[in-house]
């Protein structure tokens, strides 16, 4: 069966008994804030599998049945690949975790076999007698196999590392993410929601902006540290949402515009504070340029950022745009603020944000949309 035909097949995800040796892993075992069986069900839903089983499913509708041992922690993208990848009709494939996939015109036979089989091995034997077995054609990197409860922490680490986005800056990837992922590991065990974390992060960032009204290094540094704290905590909302399957477009929009509101507030306060300190007009003009360019850039970049997509094409310009969109600039502000020179950062921003906007618009023109 071709990949296109596979996409038209109904996907059915069935949780089965674990492979021999993993029986002690309870289906109620909590992994990153969710019971294991609930995590599997939500991952299947996110991957596009049917939410329920219909007893009188018409036989002419093909179905791809994925039989997943309950000790396997799956990524939605991996489950989606099992659903959409090419697979011959009535061919059984099995991986080392005893995950089984079969494409069939009568899925009820497979489902009934799974219901009565006492173990994954017994189910495998029964299905192998009915279907020809072929080699496993899919990747295995998208799932983590629990063999004992001691594996839970490693499984959580594996899940957390998968949350790093495509467009991470160097400092974000190697410093901020380490902190935010450590916080998220603990936060997912609580009832805090992604939107609540977005509000906390934005509040801290906005609280830091007024410190830049002063020209004193100590106050500017305090503001920069709060700005950095905002940036670190800003990663937690999306991490919680993806780990607990709470992602929503509304939440992504709130996060995106909350970030940009903080940036606008910081740039504006630097401009106002520098104007007070120097009795000059140019800081306000520079801040106005930075604010307008930031808002315009946000409008251009909105869809790609909210959907976490790479820039269209693979040109050096597209890669440069992704690099400039990162928030590593915060560390420059941190250093300059330690010496009371936040105004220097404002000057750089007044030149940099229009250049970023021009590059985004140029790529938008060349590729239709920057996505």
Regions found by a protein language model. Name each.
Residues 182-189:
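Cytosolic juxtamembrane amphipathic/interface segments immediately preceding
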Residues 249-257:
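Membrane-interface alpha-helices at helix entry/exit sites of multi-pass transporters
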Residues 59-73:
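Short beta-strand-to-loop acidic/aromatic patch adjacent to the donor-nucleotide binding site
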Residues 2-56:
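N-terminal glycine-rich phosphate-binding loop and ensuing alpha1 helix
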């Amino acid at each position: 069966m071709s990949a296109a035909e596979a996409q038209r097949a109904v996907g059915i995800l069935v949780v089965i008994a674990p492979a021999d040796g993993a029986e002690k892993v309870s289906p109620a075992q909590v992994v990153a804030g969710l019971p294991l069986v609930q995590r599997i069900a939500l991952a299947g839903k996110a991957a596009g599998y049917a939410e329920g089983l219909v007893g009188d499913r018409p036989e002419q509708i093909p179905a791809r049945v994925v039989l997943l041992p309950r000790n396997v922690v799956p990524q939605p993208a991996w489950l989606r690949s099992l659903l959409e990848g090419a697979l011959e009709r009535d061919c059984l494939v099995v991986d080392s975790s005893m995950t089984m996939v079969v494409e069939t015109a009568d899925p009820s036979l497979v489902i009934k076999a799974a219901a009565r089989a006492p173990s994954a091995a017994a189910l495998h034997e029964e299905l192998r007698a009915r279907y020809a077995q072929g080699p496993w054609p899919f990747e295995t990197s998208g799932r983590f196999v629990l063999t004992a409860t001691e594996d839970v922490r490693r499984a959580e680490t594996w899940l957390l590392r998968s949350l790093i986005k495509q467009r991470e800056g160097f400092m974000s990837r190697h410093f901020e993410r380490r902190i935010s992922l450590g916080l998220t590991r603990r936060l997912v065990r609580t009832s805090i929601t992604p939107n609540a974390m977005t509000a906390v992060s934005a509040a801290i960032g906005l609280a830091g902006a007024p410190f830049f009204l002063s020209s004193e290094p100590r106050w500017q540094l305090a503001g920069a540290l709060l700005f950095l704290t905002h940036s670190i905590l800003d990663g937690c909302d999306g991490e919680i949402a993806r780990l607990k399957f709470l992602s929503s477009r509304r939440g992504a929009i709130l996060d995106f515009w909350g970030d940009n509101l903080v940036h606008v507030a910081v740039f504006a306060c630097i401009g106002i504070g520098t104007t007070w300190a120097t009795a000059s007009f140019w800081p306000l003009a520079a801040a106005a340029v930075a604010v307008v360019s930031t808002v315009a850039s946000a409008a251009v970049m909105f869809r790609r950022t909210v959907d976490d997509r790479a820039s269209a094409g693979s040109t050096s310009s597209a890669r440069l745009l992704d690099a400039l969109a990162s928030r590593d600039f915060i560390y420059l502000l941190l250093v300059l603020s330690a010496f009371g020179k936040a105004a220097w950062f404002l000057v750089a921003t007044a030149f940099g944000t229009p250049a970023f906007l021009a590059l985004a618009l140029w790529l938008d023109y060349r590729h239709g949309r920057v996505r």
